[in-house]
Amino acid sequence: LKIKEVRDLFDSPESPTLSDEDSSAPMPTAESEISSPFIFGYHSVAHSLDSFHPPPMISHILFSAFEENVAPIILIIHKPMLRDLLQTATTNPKNFDKESEALLFSIYLSAIYSMSPEVCLAQLGADRTTLTKRYRFAVEQALVRAGFLHTRKLIVLQAAVLFLSCACDSQDAHFVWTMIAVVTRLALSLGLHRDSSHFGLGPFETEMRRRLWWYIYLLDVRSSDFQATSPQIREGDYDTLLPLNINDEDLSPDMVEPPPERTGFTEMTLTLVRCEILKLHRKLMQLSSAGIDNDGHNVLFQNRLRAIEETQVALDKQYLKFCDLEIAIHWVTATIARVALARSWLVSHFSLMSAEGFQPELFPERCDLLILTAIEVLEFGYLLESHENTTKWSWLFQGYVPWQAFAFLLSELCVRPIAPLSDRAWVAVDRVYERWVGPVGNRLGLMMRPLERLRNRAAAIRAQQSMPVTNDLDSADAGDIAPGIANPVEESQGYLGSLDIFMDVVNTIGL
């Protein structure tokens, strides 16, 4: 297939695409329009939110859901503080100041968002969508009342960050991406980008400020990936150290010396693994493409692979070797690390493939390995959402869209004959695609149209080959992720016949 043919496919108005109802730019809804008073305020901002406070029994349920489903992956609120909030919420909620009330409603909203519709109805006696809209409105009103845009208080920033972490629906993607800029500015105004050791702050405040800064950074990268743009926070903009590998019980406000770090898995390990992956991601982004030498290898490409290998070794030594895969949160941590490293390995290869002068015929030994790795990135990304071990935290992974692996596999399926590896690729592609554009909403955003067109083309070619595919994902077992990505088992194609197709998608979306 020639590049011109593929570009015609992407540019043609007659090309197969989504209907207007499924467009990647959703129409404004009543829910999304609520955000205006949150940012600017208006005269009808509620003077009291008393009617939004739930009965004590419901407060207990929501706090329990927050501790199980949200706190393990967004550890920006100290557990003793949670207990104090619950005590006040269930005894005399009118005693809350405006700042604490904003955090309280953010906790309620995130707890509801983390629950399945069935659990919401059974435990709270109300529809999840209705509750989400109700408490989102309460959060936005509370943030306005707390003076969010002018705040100098950490607790208000915690409330805003928690709120944005839960605004993961496709219609909120641009809103979150925009609001992260505001949150980042507020964080800078509070000096979170500077390590608190410069200011002589105590160990407790230092640690909580580090946790909040790094989670804002994680949220910035996540929202930017969804919009196919660069993060707003750049390396060199901050010197805030990583949080300590400790449990909340090791930390208290009256400490005068920082607690010693633990060896092994702690409550902070998952967050620290995500932060180390983030640092790797930013390092790889800084390594720009350059020319290819006569052997078809790029010095910077080798540097990328070396950086990935060094990160993998460091993660294994410091964190992953302590993971007990029979424990759910340990399994999630190990799986996130392996999938992220595999994705970084893929993207590094894709960057090499996009460099001027790249010769795919000099790359035969990597062909099937690239395909198999892309398949496993999709398979294990799917498992992170659907496996019983991750039920409590699946809401977080719904924002994970490894579109590069998805596009690469579809590009390969446009040129590959029917074979077991192709069948497995189609199963992985179909599984994740159904979730991305399923009942929870279209997650692909700006990437939707080119990926949809590419999928339609690959499906048409598949139909011509007249081979049914069994929708079976037995090849992806939950316990297989820890050792890493397997070796290819099929005969190599010899070269990447799909390169023109894939690179056109990359140029359309941006890698």
Predicted regions located by residue number:
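Intrinsic, low-complexity transcriptional activation domains
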Residues: 1-71, 94, 98-103, 108, ...
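Fungal transcription factor middle regulatory core
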Residues: 8, 15-30, 87, 118, ...
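Intrinsically disordered, low-complexity transcriptional activation domains
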Residues: 16, 394, 473-511
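Carboxylate/His-rich catalytic cores and anion/metal-binding grooves
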Residues: 59-143
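Short coil/turn linker motifs that delimit alpha-helical repeat modules in TPR/alpha-solenoid proteins
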Residues: 100, 152, 202, 209, ...
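Tandem amphipathic alpha-helical repeat scaffolds
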Residues: 108-114, 161-168, 222, 279, ...
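Long, amphipathic alpha-helical regulatory blocks in the mid-to-C-terminal portion
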Residues: 130-158, 162, 178-197, 215, ...
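Eukaryote-biased recognition of C-terminal alpha-helical segments
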Residues: 345, 409-412, 416, 432-489
